Structure formats: C-alpha cells, structure tokens
Swiss-Prot record:
GO terms for molecular function: DNA binding; DNA-binding transcription factor activity. The lineage of its organism: Bacteria, Pseudomonadati, Pseudomonadota, Gammaproteobacteria, Enterobacterales. The gene is nac. Belongs to the LysR transcriptional regulatory family. Keywords: Activator, DNA-binding, Nitrate assimilation, Repressor, Transcription, Transcription regulation. PROSITE patterns: HTH_LYSR. This is Nitrogen assimilation regulatory protein nac. Residues 1-58 form the HTH lysR-type domain. Gene3D superfamilies: 3.40.190.290, Winged helix-like DNA-binding domain superfamily/Winged helix DNA-binding domain (1.10.10.10). Residues 18-37 bind DNA. InterPro entries: LysR_subst-bd, Tscrpt_reg_HTH_LysR, WH-like_DNA-bd_sf, WH_DNA-bd_sf. Transcriptional activator for the hut, put and ure operons and repressor for the gdh and gltB operons in response to nitrogen limitation. Negative regulator of its own expression. GO terms for biological process: nitrate assimilation; regulation of DNA-templated transcription initiation.
C-alpha cells in the first residue's frame, strides 16, 4: 500500500466529497479518482460508494479507514520521534475529558505546567461523553482521554487513576451529610442519558434495591444542569469532584449516598493500536503527576493502585 493513497483515502472519507477533497489536497479530481481506483484494485474491494450527495465508505472502506488513520498517525509519530531526538519536544497533544470528571480540576494546572515545561507543545482539550471519547481514541482523533469507565472496551487501554464516591446534589430540603438510596428514590432527579457511567451506576443501584428513580429530565450540559438544580426543580447524582463544583455554582448542598455506598473509577484511556508520540507521552506523565497529588480542590480522593 502507498501511504499517499491512504492519506488521500482518509481525506476523502473525512470530507465526504471527492471534489472537495481534491481541492483540499491540491490534486485534480480525475487523478484523485484514479488513486482511489488503484487502491480498490490493491484491496480487491470497493471502498467508496459514490452518490449525487458525495461519497461514503463501504463496510470494507470503513475497516480500511480505521487502519489507515492508525498507520498514518504512527508514521507521523515516528517522524516526530526521529526529528525530536536531542531537540525540544513540540507539536499538538489532544486530550478528551468527560464532563464532571475530577480531571476538570487539573485543567488549568495541566495547561500551566505544560506551558512551563513544554513550551513548544500545544494542548488541545475536548469535552464529550465517555462513549464519544473512546470512539475518537479508536479513530485516532485523540491521544488520550480521562473518563469514568464502566467496562473494558475493545481496542482501548485503560489506566486506573482514582475512585470517587457519588453524591446527591440539590438546593431544597437538605437531607444532611449522607443520604439513603430510598430517600433518593423519593426525589425528582435530573440525570445524564443511559450511556453515561453515572447513569449506569445509579440504575444498577436502584435495580438491586428494587427501587425506581423519579427521573424528570436528562441533561448532558453541566451549565444547564447547574441552572436546573439552582431552580429547585430537582436534584442530581454526581461524582464528588463534579458535585463540589456544581454545589458551589448552584449555591446548593451535597450529601454522600451512603446506603449503599456508590463510587466510580476514573481512568486514563488510550488507543491500543499505536504508541503515544514523544510529546503526548510527556504530557501524559504531567497529567498523571497532577491527578496523583494527595488533594484535588482541597479534598481527598481514593487513588487506584
């Protein structure tokens, strides 16, 4: 396989149009079409479906796209590694963060430390759901992601970071420092969608106790959730880091769910299909050192060994 053809193919799939891809790649469309035809001949498979609206990958094309992104990324990392021997690390490092994770507390320390220690490295931070972040890792669009993990994901390597207890957060009728799950079942709740690790843990706990949650709304945005809780319409369940942040913003209270005790594991995820670039590895070490500090936002969290 020719690396240039793979690069062309990935760009076509990313854009979804041969014409636009040809413009971006500065190559004539007939020549680009010939490169695709040659690649399809090498694979002995049709890779693209051409329609009036553009092009979409076939099943074989989707498989090649995934592998091609990994191959191109590894080639880029290899070149960077060679170029950086004896030189200052430089380049971009992309990190995904799940909303409401403890990692949010180290965002500014991370940016400041990288700026001080790796001045030529640009950190790109993206916030999204855990499922979306894993998909981006597999697609080669992120170097690493910090999220609450529910179960192993094929193609993903997870490094446990710490555990956080779950807290009930609200602004009306504070139950005290701790609360029983039966009391939570009587409250109106705002929770994330069912693919969220928090939602899955809450659902599991309610099912085991044969209780039903009174969910009055599903909210993904922390900003919207803060406004909803501040209004007094209902309460929510969050890991300690997110609970403390929302509690302060909404001028509310937080109570640890103690019967039963509930927690979530925070993990650093990376793709198993390739190694990190030198600059990404350096940023990873900084991130791990920050998360491993005894206190985040002046609170003790349970580190995972």
């Amino acid at each position: 396989m020719n690396l240039r053809r793979l690069k062309y193919f990935v760009k076509i799939v990313d854009i979804g149009s041969l014409t636009q891809a040809a413009e971006v790649l500065h190559i004539a469309q007939p020549a680009l079409s010939q490169q695709v035809a040659t690649l399809e001949g090498e694979m002995d498979q049709q890779l693209l479906i051409r329609t009036k609206r553009g092009v979409t990958p076939t099943e074989a094309g989707k498989i090649l796209y995934t592998h091609a992104r990994t191959i191109l990324r590894q080639c880029e990392q290899a070149q960077l590694a060679v170029n950086n021997v004896g030189q200052t690390l430089r380049g971009q490092v992309s990190i995904g963060l799940a909303p409401g994770t403890a990692a949010s507390a180290i965002t500014m320390p991370l940016l400041q430390t990288v700026r001080n220690e790796l001045p030529e490295v640009m950190v790109y931070l993206q916030e999204s759901s855990g499922t979306a972040l894993n998909d981006k890792l597999l697609a080669g669009q992120l170097d690493m992601a910090v999220l609450y993990e529910r179960s192993p994901v094929a193609g993903i390597v997870s490094q446990p970071l710490l555990k956080e207890d779950l807290y009930l957060v609200g602004t009306r009728d504070c139950p005290g420092q701790s609360v029983d799950l039966t009391a939570v079942a009587e409250m109106n709740l705002f929770l994330p969608r069912d693919y969220s690790a928090v939602r899955a843990r809450v659902t599991e706990a309610f099912t085991l106790r044969r209780l039903s949650a009174k969910i009055i709304g599903e909210i993904e945005s922390i900003t919207t959730l803060t406004a909803a809780i501040a209004s007094g319409m209902g309460a929510t369940v969050l890991p300690e880091s997110a609970a403390r942040s929302l509690c302060g913003a909404a001028n509310g209270w937080m109570a640890r769910i103690s019967t039963p005790s509930m927690s979530l594991s925070l993990s650093l995820n990376m793709s198993a299909r390739g190694s990190l670039s030198p600059q990404a590895q350096a940023v990873k070490e900084i991130l791990l050192s920050l998360v491993s500090r005894p206190s985040l936002e002046n609170r003790e969290l349970q580190l995972v060994s």
